[in-house]
């Protein structure tokens, strides 16, 4: 047993927030799964770093440049191959839990963040190209992305809804998921295989707010917000309305804690893992945070601890004139811009 196995026994999956060809081909990813890692997430920034720093791509890049393809098509050829290979490594994990774990995420183009129909079309295409049952298509949680979520769920596609900072937007996502499930059930189709995670970003909240807060509140907002979001989750998915869908095979959306590497070196390096362990959740962690947690993290069900205190802390922050929903909208826009910039950098060498 490892600490990751202990976390899994507490109802939380630990995923790796990284993907590269070397990670898969070296056997390192397979070794991480043996330690208790349950899935993988990727994004444009991760692929940009992989393509720039992993020599295993060089020959394929050269070969793809000789073909009459756009830079985006060249990127997708390599990214789809990597995700497919990672899905194969994670397949045994996926099957051992009846399809509940072992997913690998690939994101739609950041250029489509405000285009619901474009997102749906690209997600369908990427899902078909990967052709693995444990592939998850990542979609940003803009209003357009949430509209796309409903359609993709009704299509039977598993989705990672990303860049969530807002409790209100997260609740909108749950409702869209439920509508997609209801449509699929009304059409007489199975829903048991569909898994959706709602990726709620953590450390960026504290990074954005800490400079404006008194010392006693620094480093506390993100965890308080996550705990409040989990209370919202419990209320939504234990209500009679969703219970009726669950009785017909629907899975609950799982909250996924993203951006859980600490940005402030004054904070413990496992802060955003240790503090957010709970049932029906996922935490996707970068390599350094994973190593730190394995070395000196604590496996304890902490997510429901001090729930009232979390709400009181948010009220205290609101009393200072800080609107966390306004902040959430800004952070999502910033995140979209960062992914767009990473995508442009990623494509530049593929021209």
UniProtKB/Swiss-Prot annotation:
Alphabetized GO MF terms: transaldolase activity
Family annotation (InterPro entries): Aldolase_TIM, TAL/FSA, Transaldolase_2, Transaldolase_AS
Catalytic activity: D-sedoheptulose 7-phosphate + D-glyceraldehyde 3-phosphate = D-erythrose 4-phosphate + beta-D-fructose 6-phosphate
UniProt GO cellular component terms: cytoplasm
N-terminal signal peptide: none
Localization per record: Cytoplasm
Pathway(s) the chain acts in: Carbohydrate degradation; pentose phosphate pathway; D-glyceraldehyde 3-phosphate and beta-D-fructose 6-phosphate from D-ribose 5-phosphate and D-xylulose 5-phosphate (non-oxidative stage): step 2/3
Keyword Transferase attached: yes
Pfam family, one: TAL_FSA
Superkingdom of origin organism: Bacteria
Active site: 138 (schiff-base intermediate with substrate)
Predominant subcellular localization, coarse grouping: cytoplasm
Described purpose of this protein according to its UniProt entry: Transaldolase is important for the balance of metabolites in the pentose-phosphate pathway.
Protein family per UniProt: Belongs to the transaldolase family. Type 2 subfamily.
Protein name per the record: Transaldolase
Organism placement in taxonomy: Bacteria, Pseudomonadati, Pseudomonadota, Betaproteobacteria, Neisseriales
Gene that encodes it: tal
